[in-house]
Each structure stands twice: as C-alpha cells, then as structure tokens.
Regions:
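Twin-arginine (Tat) signal peptide motif
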Residues: 6-15, 33
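Non-cysteine beta-strand/loop elements that form the S-adenosyl-L-methionine
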Residues: 334-347, 430-438
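His/Asp/Glu-enriched, well-ordered alpha-helical/loop segment
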Residues: 369-409, 413-415, 419, 423, ...
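N-terminal secretory signal peptides
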Residues: 1-10, 24
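Acidic (Asp/Glu)-rich catalytic clusters
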Residues: 326-337, 402-404, 425-427
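C-terminal region of N-terminal signal peptides and the immediate post-cleavage residues
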Residues: 24-43, 540-543
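Divalent metal-binding segments
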Residues: 17, 39-52, 57, 61-323, ...
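Sec-dependent signal peptide hydrophobic core
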Residues: 18-23
Length: 572
C-alpha cells in the first residue's frame, strides 16, 4: 500500500464508580484531541481520509464490495468505486491511502471481552495467543524485552493455553532464561494457572514474604495451579503503580488495533480481595477503569470503550447494585467512551429451577428485578444447561413484573443451549453472544457453541472473544474455530455447527451493533455514509478460501486500522 500527503466497597467507592459515567464524559472530550488535533479536536477522533483501490467489504445488508471509502470529520461520506466522486466531499485535500487491492472490513466490534483487565495486568503483559510453539513464545518474549526495562517482569496472564503449542507444554525455566536473561518472566494459564517462571522470576517469587509468600517454584520453573499461582499473581499485582496501569491500558489498546478490533464492550471483573484467592479475572471494580479514562483524557485513546458493570453480590445486605443503578447512567458518554449495562453478572449464577426458593436464586431474582425496574440492559453468563435454564426462566419471571422485551437482555457464552430456550429468550426480546473459548481445551463431548443452530434460529446473535482469561482476544482465531470446528490440538470437535467466513465477520461487525445498542447500533459495524469511519485493512484476503486456507485464518491481523478517519495502527 502507499499513501499521499482493584477490597469491599465503601459508599464513597460506589459513588466514585457511579460517577464513572461523568468521568467518561469529562475524559472523552479531551480523548480525541490528540488524535484529531489537525481537525480542531472534538469528542472523538475525527479525521479526513480516503481509502482507495481496496477490496472493501462494507457489511451492509446488501454487502457491496467497494474500492473507495471517504471519511470526513470521522464520519463516512462516500462508499463506491469513484475516487473523483469521493474527493468532491472535501473542501481541502484529504489524506489518501492506496490499499493496493488489500481486503478491508469495518472495524471489528468485540461485544464481550475484558480489555480493561488486560490493561491492568502486572508487568509488561505480552499476549501469547498467536504463538504456536515454544520457539514462538521465546521469540515473542524476546521482542518484548526490547521495550521493557532491564529487571522488569515480562508477563502473560491468561489468553493462551499450552494446547496451542506444538510441544503441548509450557516453556521451561531454561527456555525462558534463554529468551529473557535480564528480565524475570511469568506465564500463567487461565484464571489460576498452572504457571511458569524463569531464574530471575524464581528468585523473586521464592523471596515473597509471608503471610502470602513465599511462592513454591519447581526446579524447572513450574508453579502449581491454585494457591501458588494465586500467590505469584498477587505479589506482582501489589507492585503495580497507577503509571504501570496507564502503560498497560495503552498496550492493551495498541494490541487490539493490531488485530483490527476497534470497539470493545468490556464486561468487568470479579471484585478483588487482595488475597491469593484472587484469580486472573479479579480486579478492583471501583477503580479498574481509571487508568483507561486517564489515557483517554491524555488524548491517547485509540479504541472505542463500552463499559458494563459486573455485580456478584452474594450478601443479601449488599447495597452495591442498588447504588450503582441510582448513581450511574446507562449509555452515557460519547462516541469514544460510553457506559453500557449490568453484566456479565447481575448476581452469582442461579440454579435450576429458578423457582426453587433457594437463597441464591432469591438473591438473583431480586438483583434482576432491580435492573429491570431501573430499565437497564443486563447480560448474564451461561456455561451449562443449569445456567441457561435458570437465567432465561428467571428473565420470564421478571418480565411478568417489569417488562424487559425492549431492554435487550443478553445471555453470553452458551457452549450449549437448546432451541426451545433460544425461542423463549427471543420472545423476551433477548439475544445471545457466543465465544469460541472451547478452542483451547474443548473435546468432542465438551464443544460448542451451537453456532449453526443459533444463526439459523434468527435470534439476535453476536460474536465475542471473552478475551483474555480463558480465551484469546484475537477475532481471527475465533473465526477459525467458528468456521472449522477444529480445536487448538487440531481435533474437529464442533463440525456440525459451522458458520461461513462471511457469517463470522458479519457477527463481529454489523450484528454486534445490536449488542452495543443505543446510538452505537446505527453508527458502528457497517461502512456506509453517516456511520463512523472505523476500518481494518487485513494482511490476507480472509474471504478467499483458495488463497487463504483455514489454518491461515489464525495468521490474519490488521496492517492498517482506522478509527474515525484517523490511522491508529500502521504496519504497512
């Protein structure tokens, strides 16, 4: 291509987090200023840009493929095949980039992930979801050490699994030493390990003082799953400064746009207790967004962040959810940073049948009732038959008291679900977002999700990553699994539930607008006049099965990512 010129909450915490919407609104007007300084600032990136000579899949319902897209002040003003017509939309000559035939799609929307957790990781977090051997791991870590100061931890916490490596194991202490002789390294799988470290990391972990140390590390660098991994992760978290978290937020955003993911509906975290029992999915729910908001306030935000608020109040006396609903606002912010709903939990998951009268079920119903009465969107998490039955039956009970059919309540993940419950959810105005987390460690008897059944049913359906604890964030790895049914071990486990490549990208773009809701639905996910100019230009032609085989889908990334007409990633 070429171109021309983290404790329990006090009321103060709750009010602070409730004011997050206001913080988002306050930060966002500055957020676009740096990226769009040449265009007078504004509330979000607002660039002038023409992309020409591309295979640009607009993803509108007629699915035209065009060669030219023009973006003025951050909004698309022309799609078609005439550059001369595009140029008429501008008073001053815009920047123009020749895509040289490259395939482009709308900026990817991930409607369920944990990018805020990723940005709050300790150390220099280094995604390994694109590594397929120990040698790849070493190469990735070695590259990261060129950025990390000597002595700083290079870490990977979640988002990968040794099943994806040719050797089907984690790297050893010696192998990590070879990759990073001057940096401690810590790699941890999933929520609670197992983990591995190198010599410098071993020395650090074995010297952690009590009561939460030391960490037991094997001669080969291995750290057992559970308490020992919990101690290790905690020791690293206790070293985090706010500046570290700001750097992590920037790194997370840079990684996302390198994949072409421009919009993220973040689904929160479990409330951290500053204890070894905290896993990779724990953080301070009342402060975790602040590093991101600070970065946006600096004008360095390069993704669109949508924020759901996760609630797991097991104590009947807890006022957290009620205070949230009283002190925050849904869908509040601007095109760059905006609040969403309650999710991916409204309370601990109920048990089937929801009408059992158990204390847990009563608490869940009361929480859902509060959300419905406040007219908020809700998203819940289903990993089993018990989960989806109790939750969808619970939705129906709540709907009889406070109608939810226009609120778009969502069930997420669904490695399994029966079509009668899909129909029941659809009748309640709900939707389902699916994730391919079974790719890492699924088996023929524990596969899913039922992509094909859901797509054919007609319920609002979206694709998400749930990255990055137990799943990769990379949408192209998820597209690989959704279109092949093959897991990381190379075993076909979900072959009767496949999507086409076109369907997978539609779910990651246009269809995911439904899950954002509000004004976003008509502004994102499609390249058409009046919509925001978010584009991902790919390194491979995703749609050409002849030239890009199934295995190559996992190698797709973005060579050029545009947010509101501003180039936020350029790897040409």
């Amino acid at each position: 291509m070429s171109e021309t010129p983290r404790r329990g909450p006090t009321r103060r915490d709750l009010l602070r987090s409730g004011a997050l919407a206001g913080a988002a609104a306050a930060a966002a007007p500055m957020a676009g200023a740096g990226a769009a300084a040449a265009h007078g600032g504004g509330t979000a990136p607002a660039g002038d840009l023409i992309l020409t000579n591309g295979e640009i899949h607009t993803m509108d319902r007629r699915d035209p493929v065009v060669s030219v897209v023009a973006i003025r002040d951050g909004e698309i003003v022309y799609t078609g095949d005439k550059e001369s017509h595009a140029r008429k939309e501008f008073t001053d000559p815009p920047r123009a980039i020749d895509l040289r035939g490259k395939t482009a799609v709308p900026g990817i929307i991930d409607c369920h992930n944990h990018i805020v957790l990723m940005g709050n990781r300790p150390g220099y977090h280094t995604p390994l979801e694109n590594a397929y051997s120990v040698a790849d791991v070493q190469s990735t870590i070695r590259a990261r050490t060129r950025v990390a100061p000597a002595g700083a931890f290079v870490t990977t916490i979640g988002g990968f699994h040794f099943n994806q490596f040719e050797e089907r194991r984690l790297p050893s202490l010696a192998e990590l030493d070879a990759a990073a002789p001057h940096h401690p390294v810590y790699l941890s799988i999933g929520f609670t390990g197992p983990s591995v470290t190198n010599s410098l990391g071993k020395a650090f972990f074995e010297s952690v003082p009590g009561p939460d140390g030391p960490v037991t590390v094997g001669a080969d660098g291995a750290i057992a799953a559970g308490q020992q991994t919990g101690r290790a992760t905690l020791a690293l978290r206790r070293q985090l400064t706010f500046e570290d978290r700001r750097r992590g937020a920037r790194d997370a955003m840079r990684y996302a746009v390198s994949l072409g993911v421009t919009t993220h509906l973040d689904q929160g975290a479990f409330q951290a207790a500053d204890a070894p029992s905290d896993g990779a999915a724990h953080e301070d729910n009342y402060r975790m967004h602040l590093p991101f908001l600070s970065v946006f306030g600096d004008g360095d935000g390069i993704v669109r962040l949508r924020i759901n608020f996760l609630h797991m109040d097991a104590d009947p006396a807890s006022v957290a959810l009620g205070e949230r609903l009283r002190n925050a606002f849904p869908f509040f912010g601007n095109d760059l940073v905006r609040t969403g709903g309650i999710g991916e939990f409204v309370a601990p998951v109920p048990s089937d049948p929801i009408t059992s009268g158990s204390p847990g079920n009563l608490r869940w119903l009361e929480a859902a009732r509060k959300v419905a009465q406040a007219r908020w969107r809700a998203e819940v998490h289903s990993l089993s038959t018990t989960d989806f039955k109790a939750e969808i039956d619970g939705f129906a009970l709540i709907n009889a008291e406070f109608p939810i059919t226009d609120l778009r309540w969502v069930v997420g993940h669904v490695p399994s679900i029966t079509e009668d419950y899909v129909d029941k959810l659809k009748a309640l105005g709900g939707g389902i977002n699916v994730t391919g987390f079974r790719y890492f460690a699924g088996t023929p008897t524990a596969a899913g999700p039922p992509y094909r059944m859901l797509a054919d049913n007609g319920i609002p359906l979206g694709m998400s990553s749930d990255g990055m604890q137990i799943a990769p964030m990379n949408p192209w790895v998820h597209a690989y699994y959704a279109t092949t049914g093959v897991n990381a071990l190379g075993v076909a486990i979900n072959g009767n539930q496949l999507l086409t490549r076109q369907e997978a990208v539609e779910l990651y773009t246009r269809a995911n607008g439904w899950f954002l809701g509000g004004v976003d639905e008509d502004r994102l996910g499609v390249l058409a006049p009046g919509r925001l100019g978010d584009v991902a230009v790919l390194n491979r032609d995703y749609f050409d099965r002849r030239r890009v085989g199934d295995a190559d889908l996992k190698k797709i990334n973005s060579v050029l990512t545009v947010l509101g007409g501003v180039v936020v990633h350029d790897a040409r």
